[in-house]
Regions:
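Short, acidic, small-residue-rich periplasmic hinge/interaction motif at the N-terminus
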Residues: 14, 18-21, 58, 65-79, ...
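N-terminal periplasmic accessory domains that precede
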Residues: 70-73, 149-157, 197-200, 231-232, ...
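Short, acidic Ser/Thr/Gly-rich low-complexity loop/linker segments typical of extracellular
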Residues: 105-120
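Short acidic/polar hinge/loop motifs at secondary-structure boundaries
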Residues: 122-124, 209, 224-252, 295
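Face-selective signature of the C-terminal outer-membrane beta-barrel domain
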Residues: 348-376, 400-541, 562-571, 622-626, ...
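Outer-membrane beta-barrel signature, preferentially recognizing the C-terminal barrel domain
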Residues: 404, 504, 547-550, 578-632, ...
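Outer membrane beta-barrel strand-and-loop segments of large Gram-negative receptors
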Residues: 460-464, 508-510, 606, 612, ...
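Surface-exposed extracellular loop regions of Gram-negative outer-membrane beta-barrel proteins
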Residues: 488, 533-538, 563-612, 628-648, ...
Length: 825
């Protein structure tokens, strides 16, 4: 509700609020509150929020009985009430003036209060003769003996000796610990200056430069309750609309079994009606080029309905260069010296249209249709290669392959309902996702040509229901999630491998429950359990393959305990995660990369399971986490000879399960604010101990690995902001690779324009010193050594602009179902 109250009694204001709602019943005694007067402007508040706003500093209490009854009463029952009004020398109300009543006998404190927006105060006190004292910053204190409860109008005089300017400066903590991670304040902080939510997320505590959460992998991201499906959603959301970000490093059972971290963005609650919208654009130049344009429109009705449409177009031309020095030991010893260039040329469009209706603060529903189209898709790989066989020069080859993706459109529909029935909460979502892609590859050398075509069609249906239940102690939520996936893939080729025709159908049904119990004021316990059932049918050339048609029934438990005291919070947590391999790495088709390089998937891959134990300590702006992870059947690429008789010298890359890996690590983050400088420093130290001998791999290490990220933001006058971020990954020997040092320094300068600050321009330069190379020597297979140096054109300059008008908060609350299966597709 929104309303202006002007010098009315508290009972009158409560009666007006009662007439605006059918949900709440407001109970009060008229004579108990008639001495209290209010002047206030309330905007976009619920009924309980409005009552708290009106109460202010008055000695009035508000209590809730159930979900719909509100009792309001004076908390100090006295026969006498001292009341009056404080004004300044110009006759304007003096808000927040301190009024105290003292004993005439010894000047001891009897009672006190604070004036409200209109200068009024009411102080319950049964003593009939008091000393009244009024103090107000910048004005002379007033002291007199009062014998009547009616203190009248008190006019204050300015203090001629008041300092002309006094600045009281403090620093609000940018984040605080939550039961499952960190809550970060965005609104009013330096993070608000980064333009889009996509850019802002990179500067959150614990988030590394590649967008992963330190030690917890790639996060799922939600805007309010809606799962983000594509990066353009984050580009469309402006940081001025974001209230806070919660970084969840211990996700509960309501999340899919492969979700190891979550970032939930909460938007500012705003009210309004009519049209609103935004424009966003970005142009970036590197060795390639990137151009993105985005627009969104929303029309809101007074009854809480929203109609929205969004559109996005992107033109991406990526360039990657690499040199390699590889060796294969088979019947003969083969050495390859190569120079490779990748040229990616893609054009995309995105659009969605939807409707949602926030009926009241207990019920909302909506539906969205989304489409993502590929207008152009082309990848060109050129490779100049010199080949030696047993130390003698064998050939010089110029390889070239061009893969073209035909124009296509993927479609998705999401519908949801979020509401409360009595004390029960309900969150329901249903989804459909469908895609159809055709691609053709043509390539080879001057001596021979090859070709292949791939046709893939995927359909996903899913639904998810979460219920929160009332409990005598603690909180309980439970639910179920169901998904069905039907995927067909046809691969034909010109003779370098074999044709494949695969149909894979997967049905997943899960039950889950979360329970959290506070023990006293300092200790919190939580437990969650997910039962996941999977049925797979794998058909090859129209016939079921029993060896690949697996059924799984697994329990996924999670436990945590947190203790908070004196600004410190300590958490001990255990979690189980389960990952199904993506459909792309389960393909059995053999793809041509060059004359001596093929790649394929592995339909025999087993699901991966990770057991994770962690200890986390948070104090003010400091976070430390130590962890241990035990991983079974992790996925890794594997290289070996393809066919030493028919295709001598060809290396094929596929995927295998690693029997076990043990990871140990410590993550440190510190995010203090010092004047205009906002520091966000993250350091990681970790070991990886993999059991690779059973796979036939002979070279592997488990030495210390480190990563460092120093993120500096400077809040400057006149709405300017500067950010400089440095990342460093030192030389390390871990797993099957020896990796050389990589580093990057990025600079960004932003300025907000217009009185409303609705226009923002940003200039940025990434990898200024051209040092972000990937350079390593790896032994990731049997009798294969790979040395390469690759640069992904991360050095670039760009300009970004954002303009929004009549900004209102999105009310869409759909959470999306079947997220794990859609990510696999």
């Amino acid at each position: 509700m929104s309303h202006n109250f002007r010098n009315v009694t508290m009972p009158t204001a409560l009666q007006q609020l009662g007439s605006m709602t059918h949900r709440y019943t407001i109970n009060f005694i008229y004579n108990d509150l008639e001495d209290f007067r209010v002047t206030a402007s309330v905007r976009g508040a619920s009924i309980p929020e409005a009552i708290r706003h009106l109460i202010g500093f008055y000695p009035i209490s508000m209590t809730m009985v159930g979900d719909s009854i509100i009792n309001v009463e004076c908390s100090q029952k006295t026969a006498l009430r001292y009341k009056g009004r404080v004004i300044d020398e110009k006759g304007e109300p003096a808000e927040y003036a301190n009024v105290v009543l003292l004993s005439p006998a010894d000047s001891s404190f009897l009672a006190g209060g604070v004036s409200n927006e209109s200068g009024y105060f009411v102080i319950p006190c049964n003593v009939r003769r008091v000393i009244a004292k009024v103090t107000y910053v910048g004005y002379k204190s007033k002291l007199w003996t009062a014998t009547s409860p009616d203190l009248g109008t008190i006019r204050l005089q300015a203090d001629r000796y008041t300092l002309k300017g006094v600045t009281v400066q403090g620093h609000r903590l940018s984040y605080k610990p939550s039961p499952n991670g960190l809550n970060v304040i965005v609104k009013g902080s330096q993070l608000e200056q980064f333009g889009s939510a996509k850019e802002m997320i990179k500067h959150l505590p614990l988030v590394m430069g590649d967008g992963t959460v330190a030690g917890h992998g790639t996060p799922q991201i939600y805007i309010n309750n809606k799962l983000v499906r594509d990066a353009s959603e984050l580009e469309r959301l402006q940081t001025a609309e974001v209230l806070s970000a919660e970084i969840i490093t211990r996700p509960g059972a309501e999340y899919a079994s492969d979700v190891t971290s979550v970032i939930r963005l909460k938007t500012v609650r705003r009210q309004g009606e009519g049209w609103s919208g935004s424009l966003w654009g970005n142009v970036e130049k590197s060795k390639g080029m990137l151009a993105i344009a985005n627009t969104s429109l929303n029309y809101r009705l007074r009854n809480g309905m929203d109609f929205f449409i969004r559109a996005n177009a992107a033109d991406s031309k990526g360039r990657i260069t690499a040199t390699s020095n590889d060796q294969l030991k088979a019947t003969d010893t083969w050495d390859y010296h190569s120079h490779i260039k990748w040229r990616n040329d893609y054009k995309f469009i995105y659009g969605d249209v939807g409707w949602n209706w926030e009926i009241n603060d207990r019920h909302s529903l909506g539906i969205t249709y989304s489409a993502i189209g590929t207008i152009k898709g082309k990848r060109t790989i050129t490779k100049t290669e010199q080949v030696w066989r047993n130390g003698e020069h064998f050939s010089d080859d110029d390889n070239r392959s061009v893969t073209k993706t035909q124009p296509n459109l993927s479609n998705s529909i999401n519908t949801y309902y979020v509401g409360r029935l009595g004390k029960w909460g309900i969150d329901f979502s249903a989804d459909y996702y469908g895609s159809h892609t055709d691609s053709e590859m043509a390539g080879g050398t001057d001596d021979a040509s090859v070709g292949s075509s791939t046709n893939t069609r995927s359909d996903l249906w899913a639904e998810k229901l979460t219920v929160s239940a009332p409990m005598p102690a603690g909180t309980l939520s439970f639910g179920e999630e169901t998904s069905y996936t039907n995927r067909k893939a046809d691969f034909t080729q010109s003779g370098f491998s074999a044709d494949t025709h695969i149909r894979q159908r997967t049905a997943i049904w899960s039950l889950y429950a979360d329970y959290a119990l506070p023990v006293g004021k300092k200790l919190n316990l939580s437990a969650s359990l997910r039962l996941q059932n999977e049925h797979n049918r794998y058909d090859v050339d129209g016939k079921k393959d029993d060896e690949l048609s697996h059924d799984y029934h697994v329990l996924i438990p999670k436990l945590s305990m947190s203790y908070a005291d004196g600004g410190w919070q300590h958490s001990l947590a255990f979690a189980t995660y389960r990952y199904n391999p993506s459909y792309s790495i389960m393909s059995s088709s053999v793809n041509y990369r060059s004359k001596y390089e093929y790649d394929t998937g592995n339909p025999f891959l087993q699901p991966m399971t990770k057991y994770y134990l962690s200890w986390t300590t948070v104090w003010k702006w400091l976070t430390v986490e130590a962890y241990y992870a035990y991983i079974k059947n992790s996925f890794r690429t594997f290289q070996t000879a393809y066919d030493d008789v028919s295709h001598p010298g060809v290396i094929i890359t596929d995927y295998r399960n690693t029997p076990k890996i043990q990871n140990y690590g410590v993550t440190l983050n510190t995010s203090p604010t010092i004047g205009i400088w906002h520091l966000n420093y993250t350091a990681r130290l970790f070991f990886s101990d993999a059991d690779l001998a059973p796979m036939g791999i002979t070279h592997y290490w488990n030495e210390l690995c480190t990563q460092f990220r120093l993120d500096n933001t400077f809040t400057l006058p006149y709405n300017w902001t500067a950010n400089i971020t440095a990342s460093l990954t030192p030389y390390n020997k871990s797993d099957v690779a020896i990796t050389k040092t990589a580093a990057s320094v990025d600079l960004r300068i932003s300025k907000k324009w217009l009185k409303s600050k609705n226009l923002q321009l940003s200039l940025y330069a990434n990898d200024i010193f051209h040092t972000n190379y990937k350079e390593m020597t790896a032994y990731g297979g049997i009798n294969v050594r790979t040395q390469f140096k690759e640069y992904d054109s991360t050095q670039c300059v760009g300009i970004e602009f954002t303009y929004s008008f009549n900004t209102v908060r999105s009310r869409y609350k759909g959470t999306r179902a079947g997220s794990e299966e859609k990510n696999r597709l």
